[in-house]
């Protein structure tokens, strides 16, 4: 019998269409795993491959750990030695993986919404593979977003009315876009700060842009973003970038740390540039959730992967 309290999805590529009760159910499931709850027993093998076309330490390793904890069979994939370098398209690569027996593929790619070509059932008849988005260009990062929601919920127990500031290179951050969308949906109040050259008016629908020092005393969550230098090709502001000046204007130093609310927290998706977004000796401070976010990432990705297993009825799960 299908468990109505568990989420079932054919793919996990965005947070856009997630219902609030699905978000909360995924958080609850991830918390269950974190407490040592037993994973569902697979009655048949499930094969997954991690296709990372952009650099990754946390997300790649976290997904593989989650996959192994769930009992999935992980098949290695190295983009540097794949036929992509011979001109093979991502779609054709996925078609090959599917034909070889791969059930799920976790993909990180520089192209925004790369997944649309892989999940469009009307367009393709022979590709039938589950897709989990591990980050698409500057578009979405659903797994980071979900582990962020888990971390916030774990600390505060709710979302409604929480004040969250997203600070940094917002335009180029897929984490920011996923988080602002879901936080707003869950009832949090979103604010922005950082260089105006890396902020777009399209974000005004989620919150307002303010000076950092005015925001800090009011915020429950300070969500810091690194400057996405790799996405600044042709951006004249990149040549003017000065790490020391950035830290002085937009970074969390000891003075700003002390100005935060007693129960407020600092979050960062990583990698952290020490003494740019955050003073290096504050990375492991009491308010900083960086390590906890990484820890929670494994359990949330277990919940997300399990949701797709159920949605596709893989391994005997429904």
Swiss-Prot record:
Q: Which GO terms describe its biological process?
A: 'de novo' pyrimidine nucleobase biosynthetic process; 'de novo' UMP biosynthetic process; amino acid metabolic process
Q: What is its EC number?
A: 2.1.3.2
Q: Does the keyword Transferase apply?
A: yes
Kindly state which keywords UniProt assigns to this record, in alphabetical order: Pyrimidine biosynthesis, Transferase
At the top level, the lineage of the source is Bacteria
Q: For binding L-aspartate, which residues are annotated in this chain's numbering?
A: 86, 174, 226
GO function terms (MF aspect)? amino acid binding; aspartate carbamoyltransferase activity
Q: Which protein family is it in? A: Belongs to the aspartate/ornithine carbamoyltransferase superfamily. ATCase family.
Protein's job:
Catalyzes the condensation of carbamoyl phosphate and aspartate to form carbamoyl aspartate and inorganic phosphate, the committed step in the de novo pyrimidine nucleotide biosynthesis pathway.
**The protein, known as:** Aspartate carbamoyltransferase catalytic subunit
């Amino acid at each position: 019998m299908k468990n109505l309290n568990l989420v079932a999805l054919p793919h996990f590529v965005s947070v856009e269409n997630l219902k609030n009760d699905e978000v909360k159910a995924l958080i609850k499931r991830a918390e269950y795993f974190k407490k040592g709850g037993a994973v569902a027993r697979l009655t048949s093998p499930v094969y997954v491959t991690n296709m990372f076309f952009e650099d990754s330490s946390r997300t790649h390793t976290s997904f593989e750990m989650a996959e192994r904890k769930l009992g999935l069979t992980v098949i290695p994939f190295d983009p540097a030695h794949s036929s992509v370098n011979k001109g093979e398209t991502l779609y054709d690569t996925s078609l090959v993986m599917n034909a070889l027996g791969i059930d799920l593929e976790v993909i990180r790619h520089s192209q925004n919404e790369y997944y649309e070509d892989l999940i469009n059932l009307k367009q393709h008849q022979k590709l039938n593979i589950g897709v989990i988005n591990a980050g698409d260009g500057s578009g979405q990062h659903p797994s980071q977003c979900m582990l962020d929601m888990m971390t916030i919920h774990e600390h505060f127990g709710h979302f409604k009315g929480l004040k969250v500031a997203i600070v940094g290179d917002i335009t180029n951050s897929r984490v920011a876009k996923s988080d602002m969308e879901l936080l707003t949906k869950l009832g949090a109040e979103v604010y922005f700060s950082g260089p105006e050259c890396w902020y777009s008016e399209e974000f005004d629908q989620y919150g307002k842009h303010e000076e950092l020092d005015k925001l800090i005393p009011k915020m429950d969550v300070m969500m810091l973003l690194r400057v996405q230098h790799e996405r600044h090709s042709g951006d004249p502001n990149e040549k003017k970038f000065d790490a020391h000046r950035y830290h002085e204007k937009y970074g969390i130093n000891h003075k700003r740390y002390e100005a935060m609310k007693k129960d407020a927290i600092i979050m960062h998706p990583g990698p952290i540039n020490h003494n740019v977004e955050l003073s290096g000796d504050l990375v492991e401070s009491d308010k900083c959730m960086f390590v906890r976010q990484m820890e929670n990432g494994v359990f949330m990705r277990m919940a997300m992967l399990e949701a797709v297993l159920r949605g596709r009825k893989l391994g005997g799960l429904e």
